């Protein structure tokens, strides 16, 4: 389409090459790194972490992993268990059951999305260990991650903005013949117990 002079807006996931008019999306690597730094702060730079990954064949999964690892660099935090839960809550619960069976000391679970973090919480709750660890997810949808933080299930969730409104606004600009940037990076917020009632805190 792009080579035939038809404008193309790429939303959410990066594509190979430059055959598009505008890419709109958040920076998953930056979000993962912010999560890593938040986790390092909460654990005072040391502890045992379980990482439940999204589909690692996808760029969001890869970026949320590499960003997180960068965020905990230079700390004594150990990732003692990691598994690909394919973005699915039941898979995350199953993987967390394995982690709980293998490790007595788990300080925090970092999941690449909120359903993953919730699945891990349910697994820990089933063994009466949910109070022994913290749970962190990504996406921060109002009815999901943000609601879980308000209920005290998750300790934090990092927003992944979907960019629908920005995509429509960009499409209208293109139709009006206005120029648009090649890349629009959307900002993100963290919602934790300290700020969730105030609408979260913007990431720098």
Model-derived segments and spans:
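Flexible loop/hinge segments that line or gate small-molecule binding clefts
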Residues: 1-30, 34, 41, 48, ...
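Hydrophobic alpha-helical
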Residues: 1-3, 68, 80-81, 85-147
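Structural recognition of the beta-strand scaffold that forms the well-ordered cores
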Residues: 7-12, 25, 48-52, 81, ...
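Solvent-exposed loop/turn segments at secondary-structure junctions
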Residues: 14-17, 29, 55-59, 85-89, ...
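Short, amphipathic alpha-helical "lid/cap" segments that border enzyme active or binding sites
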Residues: 29-36, 40, 93, 161-168, ...
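Short, solvent-exposed amphipathic alpha-helices that sit
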Residues: 31-36, 59-77, 91, 95, ...
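Short, hydrophobic alpha-helical segments
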Residues: 39-44, 100, 171-179
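Hinge/cleft segment of the Venus flytrap/periplasmic-binding protein
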Residues: 56, 60, 71-72, 162-204
């Amino acid at each position: 389409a792009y080579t035939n002079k038809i404008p193309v807006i790429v939303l959410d996931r990066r594509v190979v090459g430059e055959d598009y008019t505008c890419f709109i999306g958040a920076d998953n690597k930056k979000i993962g790194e912010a999560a890593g730094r938040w986790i390092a702060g909460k654990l005072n730079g040391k502890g045992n972490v379980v990482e439940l990954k999204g589909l690692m064949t996808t760029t969001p999964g890869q970026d949320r992993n590499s960003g997180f690892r960068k965020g905990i660099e230079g700390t004594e935090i150990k990732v003692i268990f990691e598994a690909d839960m394919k973005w699915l809550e039941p898979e995350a619960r199953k993987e967390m059951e394995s982690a709980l069976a293998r490790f007595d000391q788990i300080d925090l679970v970092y999941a690449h999305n909120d359903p993953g973090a919730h699945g891990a919480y349910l697994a820990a709750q089933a063994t009466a260990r949910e109070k022994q660890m913290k749970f962190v997810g990504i996406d921060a949808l109002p009815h999901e991650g943000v609601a879980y933080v308000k209920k005290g299930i998750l300790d934090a969730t990092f927003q992944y903005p979907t960019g629908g409104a920005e995509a429509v606004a960009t499409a209208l600009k293109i139709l009006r013949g206005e120029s648009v940037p090649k890349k629009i990076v959307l900002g993100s917020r963290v919602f934790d117990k300290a700020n969730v009632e105030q609408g979260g805190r913007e990431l720098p």
